[in-house]
């Protein structure tokens, strides 16, 4: 059985309203985008059999990311992240540091969401899960991959505006999750956060090269977590 989350708090509704304003005309003369076209929070119950999650997000045509978390039931599973750039079988865990692994949790990205396999971590019978789906869209969300060089470099993105938040994971080996946020400090390009720990902000030029992101690129420094030579991110 699949159910969609329909109740939101006042704060969440205000956030959705602000997103709707951002997307008005964001397509650059094409169809107007609504928040429901590019983002979904969806609750479902596992059935230990293949099942589609029809949340209305076009992942097969536009690309994006699916983030799944076990909520309650007989087991405690971690966060499971899959995106269209790395492929449906490649998984990352946002609460830990390992490299990506090959798993059979999601079988396909679809024009109306995604489909689950019978894998227990994301679809165990009578267990409850939450999924968050982000579709690629200008001024909202993008997923990019790159190979590190060991020297400070820029990485292109397709947002068309300076990103407010950047999350980077080394997919080749175990490394912390690097986080940039424009409201983190007075000079956020000089600082970093780590997604998988509770550590406070750290000042270091090795992560963002003390360079603010732009509407077309962001900059990474020389730290292994963001730019090791020959490793993938």
Task: Describe every region a protein language model picked out.
Residues 2-233:
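Surface-exposed molecular-recognition determinants
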């Amino acid at each position: 059985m699949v159910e969609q989350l329909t109740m939101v708090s006042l704060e969440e509704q205000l956030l959705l309203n602000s997103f709707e304003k951002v997307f008005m005309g964001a397509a650059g003369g094409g169809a107007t985008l609504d928040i429901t076209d590019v983002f979904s929070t969806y609750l479902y119950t596992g059935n230990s059999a293949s099942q589609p999650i029809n949340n209305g997000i076009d992942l097969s045509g536009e690309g994006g990311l699916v983030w799944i978390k076990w909520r309650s039931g007989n087991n405690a599973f971690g966060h499971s992240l899959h995106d269209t750039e790395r492929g449906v079988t490649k998984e990352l865990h946002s609460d830990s540091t390992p490299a990506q692994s090959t798993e059979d949790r999601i079988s396909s990205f679809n024009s109306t969401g995604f489909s689950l396999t019978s894998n227990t971590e994301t679809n165990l019978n009578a267990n409850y899960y939450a999924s968050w789906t982000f579709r690629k869209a200008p001024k909202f969300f993008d997923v990019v991959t790159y190979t590190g060089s060991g020297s400070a470099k820029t990485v292109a993105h397709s947002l068309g505006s300076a990103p407010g938040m950047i999350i980077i994971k080394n997919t080749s080996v175990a490394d912390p999750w690097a986080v940039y946020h424009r409201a983190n400090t007075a000079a956020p390009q000089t600082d970093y956060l780590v997604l998988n720990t509770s550590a406070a902000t750290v000042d270091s030029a090795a992560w963002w090269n003390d360079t603010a992101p732009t509407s077309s690129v962001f900059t990474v420094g020389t730290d292994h977590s963001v730019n090791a030579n020959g490793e993938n991110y």
